[in-house]
């Protein structure tokens, strides 16, 4: 990380009033940050990204294809791993966002998130913040799935993949960590979904974030346990692969 970059941030939104509002939130609660704003990630320079420790991106204001926008951000996340990426996601973007943007350095918030939750996320930083807001996994967002009646019969490999997904890892990262191909990891994820009788990524993350999912996968970090992301945890995951 370049010297001083932790005090530089970027606000991205195609909606001018949202840009202004997010900048005002940062100015009020984090005066130590120097914030620039942009209507699009494509307009940012390499230097601006390299200097920044925080990006708040309003995806709810995007009018383009959700997948192409998320894929572009996925590419940026892969290149700039020191940045804490905070994405504000609308209901229609939820499925694409959890598939492509969930990772250890990103946080997904609802586009109707209370300001205090955004402030808490920024203050927590990219190693302590929750990976996904409870508002995004609430019944209103996930169309009410009742998982309590489902009997869980998952293989060890399937549990391992779902556990890492629940902790914010992407398919590529899991494949690299477990020394398996992307195809194998995707197959294990899909097999687990079939066993659980769930049919979409959004429903899968809803199960992972449910009380049953957290219990079955031993995932207290879903509710904010920062210790999951330290080096010791990574060593434990690798030793179990």
Swiss-Prot record:
Is Ion transport included in the keywords of this UniProt record?
A: no
InterPro entries, per this entry?
Sig_transdc_resp-reg_C-effctor, Tscrpt_reg_LuxR_C, WalR-like, WH-like_DNA-bd_sf
One of the GO BP terms on file: response to methylglyoxal
The lineage's top-level taxon is: Bacteria
Q: Which PROSITE patterns match?
A: HTH_LUXR_2
| Induction field | Repressed by H-NS, activated by LeuO. Member of the yjjQ-bglJ operon.
**Which ranges of the sequence are annotated as binding DNA?**
171-190
Q: Would I find Transcription regulation among this entry's keywords?
A: yes
Q: How does it assemble?
A: May form homodimers.
> By what name is this protein known?
Putative transcription factor YjjQ
């Amino acid at each position: 990380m370049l010297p001083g970059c932790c005090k530089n941030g970027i606000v991205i939104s195609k909606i001018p009033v949202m840009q202004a509002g997010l900048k005002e939130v940062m100015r009020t609660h984090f005066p130590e940050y120097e914030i620039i704003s942009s209507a699009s990630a494509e307009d940012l320079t390499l230097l601006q990204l390299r200097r920044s420790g925080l990006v708040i991106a309003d995806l709810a204001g995007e009018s383009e294809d959700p997948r192409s926008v998320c894929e572009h951000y996925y590419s940026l996340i892969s290149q700039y791993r020191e940045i804490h990426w905070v994405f504000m996601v609308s209901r229609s973007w939820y499925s694409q966002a959890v598939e492509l943007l969930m990772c250890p350095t990103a946080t997904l918030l609802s586009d109707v998130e209370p300001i205090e939750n955004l402030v808490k996320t920024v203050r927590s930083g990219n190693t302590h913040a929750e990976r996904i807001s409870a508002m995004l996994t609430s019944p209103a967002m996930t169309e009410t799935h009742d998982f309590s009646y489902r009997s869980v019969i998952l293989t060890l490999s399937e549990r391992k993949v779902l556990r890492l997904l629940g902790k914010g890892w992407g398919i590529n990262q899991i494949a690299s960590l477990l020394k398996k191909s992307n195809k194998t990891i995707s197959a294990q994820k899909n097999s687990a979904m079939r066993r659980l009788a769930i049919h979409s990524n959004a429903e899968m993350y809803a199960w992972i974030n449910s009380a049953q999912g957290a219990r079955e996968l031993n995932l207290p970090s879903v509710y904010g346990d920062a210790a999951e992301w330290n080096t010791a945890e990574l060593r434990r995951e690798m030793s179990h692969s």
